[in-house]
Amino acid sequence: MTQIKNSTLAPSPKPVSFKEALKFWIKLGFISFGGPAGQIAIMHQEVVERRNWIGENQFLRALNFCMLLPGPEAQQLATYIGWRLHGTWGGIVAGSLFVIPSIFVMMLLSYLAVAHVDIPAVAAAFYGIQPVVVAVVIEAVLRIGKKALKHRVLYGFAVLAFVCIYFLKVPFPAIVALAAIGGLIMKQMLPQVFCRGQFDFNTRECRMEDQSDSFGNLTRPSVAHVIRTFLVCLVLWVVPVGAVWLWRGYSDTLTQIGLFFTKAAFVTFGGAYAVLSYIADFGVASGWLSMPQMLTGLGLAESTPGPLIMVTQYVGFLGAWNIPGELSPLCAGVLGASLTTYVTFLPCFFFIFAGAPFIEAMAGNQRLQAALTGVTAAVVGVVLNLAVWFGFKVLVPDNSVDIFSLSGAGISLLLLVKFHFPIHFLVPVGAVAGVVWKLLL
């Protein structure tokens, strides 16, 4: 995660008009490349350093809160900042505009990926993207592992998670739950390992970051507020998903898409990479898409603005396109993609609007921090499973080594790890290399 300095003498935040903030949120939706680290860095530079709309402590506290939640932390952070500046409507506008540009871009790319894949140049381009994706996932294992695995016990969490998901086929939500319980148990024996603040070895206590700053008077934390927010979001979920259920029936692909991605939205701890194998497992087993198509979708999501979790929209589009029922594939695909995106991000708004008033209490909860330390370590094993799974599919198809894919993955990994080459540039380079290899050599 991007390191952000604390500033002790920062000037007081200045008021900002809704119109001025709206212009920034529109702009952010089109420039939010670079994954969550890049997106969070852009927001910090713009809203804290350059524009001084919120203070450093407020930004850091909001970021810590969003990192505790399932779902894309950068989109949730934008929602929080919008809420902090202009209340509920500010949060809705900020969170929505963060993803709207990528919705249309991914919709177009998803269509090209299935409707025109029989064109040799298009097929070759997608072939070239796949080894880049393998390298991206391997780099994610290295990056997340470096940050999360600070002790041999945490390495044990990662290894057990890999064994459970790769060999024993334990569902991802169960791994999250078991890792959280393990974190709570191990905190009693090794509190210094499961402390996310500063551990005092004399008192054997974990000292969390000072949380004394006020968050203003937007919304007071209360159970009534949480219940109201939950009921509103529940109605907003029931209306479209229920309508599809009544129209198409429970077993229809569109209904299953709505139900599955609702469940997935609540287990995306550790970012999009952590839940990808869960989504890919279900999607491939359900006949929604093939493994090469899943790899293509991840590559497209990496190279477009917006959160990486937008790969779910691609899966929803292809699932409905491939099993459209009596609808046309295009109509079914658009409906599937739209429903997927809606149920993926609706919980994000609920988490922010219901939880932001409780942010100080949550940030200092040591048991919660210990549970999340266990989950974060387990996520490394889950992402490693994804790397192994993708690697075999791409590098050793049909039990024979693919020289182009092996070379492409190796070169891509070198560029990512050694030279920090931007992913959104590397994916198009891979596409061009695939075209050259397939059509010109």
PLM segments and residue spans:
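Multi-pass membrane proteins that catalyze or facilitate reactions on polyprenyl-/lipid-phosphate substrates
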Residues: 1-69, 80-304, 308-441
